[in-house]
Amino acid sequence: MRTHYCSELRNDHVGERVTLCGWVDRRRDHGGVIFLDVRDRTGLIQIVSDPERTPEAYPQADALRNEYVVRIHGEVSRRPDDSLNPRLPTGEVEIYADQIELLNAVHQQLPFQVSTADVESVKEELRLKYRYLDLRRDRMHQNIMMRHRLIQSIRRYLEDQQNFVDIETPVLTRSTPEGARDYLVPSRANPGEWFALPQSPQIFKQLLMVSGFDRYYQIARCFRDEDLRADRQPEFTQLDMEMSFMSQEEIIQLNEDLMRHVFKTLKDIDLPKTFPQMTYAEAMERFGTDRPDTRFDLELVNVSDLLEDSGFKVFSGAIKKGGQVKVLPIPDGNAKISNVRIKPGGDLFSEASAGGAKGLAYIRVKDDGAIDTIGAIKDNLSPEQTAELLERTGAKPGHLLLFGAGPTEIVNASLSRLRLALGAEMKLIDPDQIDLLWITEFPMFEWNADEKRLEALHHPFTAPYPEDEADLKTARAQAYDLVYNGLEIGGGSLRIYQADLQRRVFDAIGLSEEEAQDKFGFLLNAFNFGAPPHGGIAYGIDRLAMLLSGEESIRDTIAFPKTQQARCLLTQAPSSVDQKQLKELQIKSTAEPKN
């Protein structure tokens, strides 16, 4: 049907007869000569229909409109010197069409312009409703192709250079505790019983290690029924990897090699030979988050020990209750940040409130080195405390010190949000810089206040450090997350591979022996048959594709995404189903019917 893709043609093809297929991207009539930009998935080529040179094709060219589907037969010609277009790979040539076939027309008004030349902003709801048109647009087309090349580069590296095996794991499995809610699938063959769609292939990839497949990977589809944000989808894709007989440092080294391969292949970027590492405790202390953006220098300073005896009760009271007082020092903050922004109703107050803070205290360092603040703080800081505070924070004349006081998690969350907001506002972040950082030594568990129990910070199959096994409740996990400019792109750990230790971890999170056996008996039993030491990692393909494409939402790198309400605007899923189907499954809905 065609001899070439549109974007393949160059000067070397001049004089050749070619057949092309694609969509009319744009039509222009210049003094009776019709110019068509025809588009396929590789790009654009200019088609010329001249009534004097090729009169047999002119009527068809004259009838064409944007997004008509066509087949073009003609001869490749060099463009006149004054018509060269250096912005196009095909900008030195054009096709004189002597035959044009209309394969399909557009029978409705386009909801928005698709043309590569059109840069109008289109509402996302409209784009998602007509996603097949949106995907024709150059930006979206490039995003999907970047995603394809990302997965292609991963496969080639893991299989050709690292001897990994691609193995599929079940999509219909059983529901297990921990983590987000499962998507459940009723079993018609087994009434009253349910499958769950996998949140990850975690257990199956560990079983593959027990099975002797020492280097496994999969581009896996995963499902989580959770509240959505800009970077979350109910169904998502991850690169899933698991390796036997490798230490944590060996796994980290292999993954650094993988990232270097991906970035060099796709962006021609040379990443460093090794990526820096930072413990979870250090990241939380310095940046208030376990995924710090280290492209700029604003750091939090813990002054709890200095202010625990302060007469200012907001500070001393927070510390006595087991909380912290931290400072975010802002160079030149006096000139750039007004009190209005810090007080209730101000944007910085609102940013801190989003992290849970009830207010913001501040100190300004005046040009003469004296401090300016509210009386309650100034009156309750001794000269020695003030001097020590300025020294610890590195404050100089012109500095603004923003304080967070309260429960540690709230102080960290609120000040880390302020740090990012001010870093962006003050243009401290180089948008072209890439910082990759490993966060290590996570706590094994965190306290769930609602359920009044410990829960695994990552998942309950993560191995503790051997020296911490005696007291699991305070143990560090042999876990590692890879952070890209403040976004987590991958996370993994060494795994438990001994049944007794796995039972102890289940017990620590409140799973009884009976529950553990019911939910995970098959895994515990497998560990009794010679399970090797193993570990792994998983990367979010959607997020990686987003970052490599320079987008701000993963929805722009997924062909058919859901909205933040977990709906597909194209197919109108989810939808009600026929009562006959529910009857076969022995299910009855208690929800009110929708109009």
From Swiss-Prot:
L-aspartate binds at residues 178, 224, 458, 495. It holds the Pfam family GAD. The record marks 30 as: Important for tRNA non-discrimination. Keywords: Aminoacyl-tRNA synthetase, ATP-binding, Cytoplasm, Ligase, Nucleotide-binding, Protein biosynthesis. ATP binds at residues 224-226, 233, 488, 540-543. GO terms for molecular function: aspartate-tRNA ligase activity; aspartate-tRNA(Asn) ligase activity; ATP binding; nucleic acid binding. It is found in: Cytoplasm. GO terms for cellular component: cytoplasm. PROSITE patterns: AA_TRNA_LIGASE_II (PS50862). This is Aspartate--tRNA(Asp/Asn) ligase.
